[in-house]
């Protein structure tokens, strides 16, 4: 009888705690709307030079920037090709524009685009080959975006 009473007491205590503690509000619309987006930066590490995958990531980054969040995109591996002024970028039917156009508007609207120097060299790109406003990433500078207070990191 003692074990059953102990079990029931534990169960009732658990239920009481479950209903006594307020629900988390990390993802409800009111909490997100009332947070200061400018204090919640996003760092996106982009690794794919594929036009459609790149467009999706850049479109997401630009939408996040438009919500007021500071956004920095680090283009590395073959994603550096997304910032090239010339060269083919396939435009699929679901894409409203090619990646370089999204990047240009993203920069114009205040977003930061960082490039991997060794990756550019690997693909034969120079700074003059890139759309205006792209910055070279470098040790210490790039990490400033990654480890900024409240920053979130996303790899695309």
Give a label for each model feature.
Residues 54-69:
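Histidine-anchored nucleotide/phosphate-binding helix
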């Amino acid at each position: 009888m003692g074990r059953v009473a102990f079990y029931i007491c534990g169960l009732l205590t658990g239920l009481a705690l479950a209903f006594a503690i307020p629900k988390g509000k990390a993802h409800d619309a009111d909490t997100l709307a009332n947070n200061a987006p400018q204090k919640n930066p996003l760092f996106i590490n982009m690794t794919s030079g594929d036009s459609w995958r790149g467009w999706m990531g850049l479109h997401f980054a630009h939408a996040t920037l438009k919500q007021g969040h500071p956004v920095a995109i680090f283009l590395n591996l073959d994603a550096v090709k997304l910032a090239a002024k010339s060269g083919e970028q396939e435009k699929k039917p679901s894409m409203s524009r090619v990646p370089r156009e999204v990047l240009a508007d993203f920069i114009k609207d205040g977003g930061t685009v960082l490039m991997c120097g060794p990756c550019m060299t690997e693909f034969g790109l120079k700074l003059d080959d890139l759309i205006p406003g792209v910055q070279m990433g470098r040790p210490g500078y790039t990490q400033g975006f990654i480890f900024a207070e409240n920053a979130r990191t996303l790899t695309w």
